């Protein structure tokens, strides 16, 4: 829901089409055409790497792909590397990816999603799947796909009068699984890359 609200704000602000006023004097909103097929392809490509579980080749390859897509669309990209500690003591090699449109602009829009996948399907109705990773198509990959599509649109029309920061958080999905006997509330084990 937050992504859709941000998407609407960006699309409305990106308008370059000439419009005429309505009967009450308000200008109709105009913006570039969001291409759902393009966003779908970006989501699919992430899933083709496999589950982007922390410390996996799929995770690292996907991160490199995300960086290259943002760079392809003219964004200024930086990465925040960190070694984080999971709830179970696992060292997690995390990389937040920040892609900026008009990085010198002082008025900015912030849009965020995460790209890592849950290593356990602990909410699956079938307990036989609890130890399997989640593909993360409708969670991490979809949000990142929308951000990449927005970056593509901004690369075609830079009339937006403010900057945009796209942040792809990492280590969001390593929270305590439901089947764990972990002591404590576990609330600080989620969204490690954003802490």
Can you annotate each of these PLM segments?
Residues 46, 80-82, 101-103, 112-116, ...:
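Active-site-proximal beta-strand/loop segments in catalytic clefts of secreted hydrolases
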Residues 131-195:
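Acidic/histidine-rich catalytic neighborhood of metal-dependent amide-processing enzymes
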Residues 10-13:
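C-terminal motif of bacterial Sec signal peptides marking the signal peptidase cleavage site
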Residues 15-18:
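Bacterial signal peptide processing site
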Residues 44-104:
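A non-catalytic alpha/beta surface segment that caps or lines the substrate-entry region
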Residues 73-75, 105-109, 160-165:
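Loop/turn elements at helix/coil->beta-strand transitions in domains of secreted/extracellular proteins
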Residues 20-45:
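Post-signal peptide N-terminal segment of mature Sec-exported envelope proteins
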């Amino acid at each position: 829901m937050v992504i859709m609200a941000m998407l609407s704000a960006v699309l409305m602000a990106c308008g370059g089409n000439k419009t005429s006023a309505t009967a009450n004097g308000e200008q109709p909103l105009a913006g570039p055409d969001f291409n759902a097929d393009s966003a779908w392809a970006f989501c699919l490509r992430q899933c083709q790497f496999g589950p982007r579980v922390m410390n996996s080749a799929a995770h690292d390859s996907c991160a490199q792909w995300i960086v290259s897509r943002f760079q392809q669309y003219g964004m200024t990209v930086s990465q925040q590397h960190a070694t984080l500690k999971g709830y179970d003591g696992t060292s997690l090699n995390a990389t937040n990816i920040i892609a900026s449109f008009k990085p010198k602009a002082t008025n900015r829009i912030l849009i965020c999603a995460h790209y890592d996948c849950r290593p356990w399907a602990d909410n699956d109705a079938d307990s036989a799947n609890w130890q399997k990773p989640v593909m993360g198509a409708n969670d991490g990959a979809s949000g990142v796909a929308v951000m990449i599509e927005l970056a593509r649109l901004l690369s075609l029309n830079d009339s937006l009068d403010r900057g945009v920061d796209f942040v792809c958080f990492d280590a969001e999905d390593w929270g305590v699984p439901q089947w764990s006997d972990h002591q404590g509330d576990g609330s600080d084990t989620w969204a490690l890359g954003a802490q």
